[in-house]
Amino acid sequence: AFRTSLLFSRAGGVKIVTVTSVLPREGKSATAANLAVVLAQLGRRVLLVDADLHRSRVHEVFGISNRAGLVSILAEGVEPSRVIVKTSVPGVFVVPAGPETPNPSALLSSENMRQFLALAAANFDHVVIDTPPVLATYDVLVFGQYTDGVVLCVRAGVTPRDQVREVRDKLLRGGVPILGVVLNGRKLDTDYYEYRYLNYGERAAATEDPSRESEAEAGAAS
């Protein structure tokens, strides 16, 4: 299974994984959400971080507020425990992108980002980061210093092969390991994730009062 190969593809397993795509609308946010869920099914505590500060979608997938999030942590100094949302999917927690910012790349490459991910890695078994498409921005290359590797999403019959090769080469030159490629938009005979797909935009149920539960959970973890 994909989740098993991801966990054991590197010595010591994978702690922080980045999910990206070649181009927009290739299903990366849904893939990141699915990956968080299947890792949680193994009994792990997983934090899903929406670092696509250009076109955030994770809050839509889970049907949660985007008023506060990663930008609040990085630019405003808000405590992570105040923005981490505990979803009704056991073991899955979310940090949405939060308010718009004029300079996403500067925030993602900041010392505050490094400190936040170090804190997240210390309190969760896995951290899954949804980032912008590689050919849209250079943001994903910033995560080469943070992540154990990248899962690259492509869309069947849509993503040009030459652009897939371009992205592969760009990631490897940037020192970002590629853990695997997910082909979206193709009907498979078996459940690729051993778990039904969340369609892009389909909402996973959230808790009735996620902010309160999130603060309590984060406090317990610290």
Language model regions located:
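P-loop NTP-binding module
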Residues: 1-222
